[in-house]
Amino acid sequence: DLDPAANGFYLKQQIKSYGPLDVKQLDGEWDYCIVHQQAPTSKEVNNTDLAIGRFIHPAKKDKSFLWHNGIIKEGKFEGDWDTEWLFDQVLNEDLNEVDGTFACMLYHENQIYVFRNEISPLFKSDSTFSSTLFPGASTVTPNVYWKLDYNSEILEQGFNFKTKENPYYFGE
C-alpha cells in the first residue's frame, strides 16, 4: 500500500508458509502484492529452521525485505542462506562480485526496487512483475537496480552492476 506520510510504500501484511499460497489469507485491501513461492536455498536446513520458516522469503533486515529468485553458487557466499548474503550485497550496492543467478524485489525505506542479472529472467507489464513470461510483458533490463515509482508505474534507474559470470552467449 501507499503511505502518503512515508512518501512511498508501506508493508501491510506478511505471510510466510510452505506450499501453495492460500489467497484467502490476503485481506484484499492492498495496492501491490509480492508473492514468492520457492524451495529453501540454504547450505543446510534443519528441523528447527524448517519449523520457524527461517529460509522462507522474504529475508528481513530491520524494516527491509528481499525476495530472491535464483541460486548463488555454493562456496561463493558467507553464512547459511544465499538470500541473506545477497541482501548485504544489495544494501552495500555491491552486486558485481555476486556469482550465481538472481532476480529480486526489495522493499527498503518505503520503496520497492527490482533488479536482475543477465542470467535470471524477470518480466514486467505496468506494475506486474514475474519470473515467468506472460502476455504483454517485456524483459526488465538486466544489471540495473530499478526503483518502482508508485504513482506513474514506471521504473527509475538506479545504480548499474555487472553479471560476474554468464555461461551463455547471446549473439548479435
Regions found by a protein language model. Give the residues of each.
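N-terminal segments that mediate ammonia production and transfer
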Residues: 1-172
